[in-house]
Regions:
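Structured interaction patches on ligand/partner-binding surfaces of diverse proteins
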Residues: 121-146
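Conserved, short, structured surface segments that act as functional micro-motifs
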Residues: 2-55
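Short, ordered, surface-exposed loop/turn motifs in non-cytosolic proteins
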Residues: 62-90
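Beta-strand signatures of extracellular beta-sandwich domains
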Residues: 29, 72-76, 118
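Surface-exposed loops/turns
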Residues: 22, 111-112, 134
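A short, amphipathic beta-strand motif
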Residues: 56-62
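Short Pro-Gly-centered beta-turn/loop motif in secreted/extracellular proteins
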Residues: 97-116, 120-123
Length: 146
């Protein structure tokens, strides 16, 4: 029900056989403040990562601070081997950024370590270094175009 609080272990839904889908999947939304689509947030910021992993959130921006939409970003671990991790920044208008973070991308279940965040665009490579710690949201910002 709208406004209902949930705790770890609460059943939120059950799998059924109604509707049309090509395979099992879950639609999960987090809504903050109001029960409408304009209040959605990225659920990866609200879900605990897998044990011994962290979450990376950040911003990919132009030199004037404007968010860049659908920019590809990857994480390369510098201090040891790690699984390939990549995503794109949000499309314009969705999902909505967290009102405190103002992020435009999130990656979950990232193995802890020292990483280089990489955005390649227009034949140029932009990087930022970050440490990823387990059990928390780790932050990085890349300015593209300087």
């Amino acid at each position: 029900a709208p406004g209902q609080r949930v705790a770890r272990g609460d059943v939120l839904g059950l799998s059924g056989a109604s509707g049309v889908a090509d395979g099992p999947h879950l639609h999960l939304e987090v809504r903050v403040g109001q029960n409408n689509y304009a209040s959605t947030r990225n659920p990866l910021l609200w879900l605990e990562p897998l044990p011994q992993t962290g979450v990376v959130a950040g911003r990919i921006v132009a030199p004037d601070g404007q968010l860049l939409f659908e920019a590809p970003i990857s994480l390369v671990r510098v201090d040891a081997a790690a699984p390939y991790t990549a995503t794109t920044s949000y499309a314009q208008g969705e999902p909505n950024s967290d009102s405190t973070l103002g992020e435009n991308f999130v990656m979950d279940d990232v193995v802890p370590g020292f990483y280089q965040a990489i955005v390649e665009t227009g034949g140029r490579r932009f990087t930022a270094d970050l440490w990823v710690y387990p059990g928390r949201v780790n932050w990085v910002e890349l300015v593209v175009g300087q």
